[in-house]
Amino acid sequence: MKFLIAFAVLALVACINANPYGSNRGYEGGRVAYVQEVGYGGGSYGNQGYGNHGYGNRGYAQPLYSRSSNPSASAAAAAASAGIRPGRYEQAAVIGYDLDASYNGHSRGGYGRGGY
């Protein structure tokens, strides 16, 4: 019974330590970092001058990578089966990005994503 309680406490500590949302210990405190790589093959017109999007296609998707900032926290999360697995995630998985990147017309001198 002692081992069961000890394992449950260790699993709870590992979940709290590796939680990417509830930690207030800064970036290096066991958080999972999402890194967005720069895309390529952007718009066909005004790629640099008008909001970095242009009028043409938006280019290829920009992949997201999940990378842990603390190896011991990711090992603890894997042991507790509560962590996000390191790997490659596509841009469509982040809902807020697609909502924010919508076209809103001529706003503050730029096209594509507006000034606000």
Swiss-Prot record:
Signal peptide: 1-18
Subcellular location: Secreted
Main location as per UniProt: secreted
This protein's record includes keyword Signal: yes
GO BP: chorion-containing eggshell formation
Transmembrane segments: none
Keyword Secreted: yes
InterPro entries, sorted: Chorion_2
Keywords: Secreted, Signal
Pfam families in alphabetical order: Chorion_2 (PF03964)
Top-level taxon of origin: Eukaryota
Any one of the GO CC terms: egg chorion
Role of this protein: Chorion membrane (egg shell) protein; plays a role in protecting the egg from the environment.
Family: Belongs to the chorion protein S15/S18 family.
Protein name (database record): Chorion protein S15
Organism listed in the record: Drosophila virilis (Fruit fly)
Encoding gene, per UniProt annotation: Cp15
